Amino acid sequence: MKTEFDKIIKDKYGIISGNKKLIFVKTGRGGTCYGHNNKYLNLANEISNLYGYSVIISAYPTDSVCNLQEELEKIKSYIADYEEVYFIGISAGALLGAQQGYLNEKITRMLLVNGPIMINWPKTKRGIEKFQGERVEMIYGMKDPSYRYYDILSCINSAKLVCTAIEGADHNFIGMEDILASKMKEFIQV
């Protein structure tokens, strides 16, 4: 397994080159493209090795305002033209995907993990309902602070939405990282 990305762009994007399908992972606020104990680098390598896909891990600096459309436009100059995007968002990255993912027609699937439910809930609900891709999966650890609002997800009017609660998992899936990695691989395969 590689111990580094193929490319690092301004400490914001870690890139593993592959085929025309792109897995775009947006970390939580303050997250780096490597993640704690290289969890994102390892995930990127595993996905690339298993499926041959291109993978970009996008850091979410604490002091930044992110625009998903702008980010997907920026990366075009660093990676070969991609035909399809599977978006994986963690925490604030999940919120970004829920609220803005529908704006990009190349995003065909979204996996949103522990996104803060009550930060601009109407915008989150509207974004999921407008999403025209194949599938949206929202995963919440039952020990995550947002889990107490989990039932409100049933108000989202979308046949493409699947919601999953993971017993024992906290916001960072500490001690359960393998379960989260398994869910991510399952999401990519389906």
Where are these regions (language model features)?
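Short, surface-exposed "cap/lid" segments of acyl-processing enzymes
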Residues: D6-I57
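Alpha/beta-hydrolase active-site loop
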Residues: K39, T62-D81, Q99
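Active-site nucleophile loop of the alpha/beta-hydrolase fold
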Residues: Y60, L111-N120, G141-K143
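Gly/Ala-rich beta-loop-alpha elbow adjacent to hydrolase catalytic centers
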Residues: I88-G97
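Short beta-strand/loop motif that positions the catalytic acidic residue
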Residues: F131-Q132, M138-Y140
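Conserved alpha/beta-hydrolase "acid-adjacent" motif
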Residues: P145-D151
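Catalytic histidine-centered segment of alpha/beta-hydrolase-like enzymes
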Residues: A169-D178
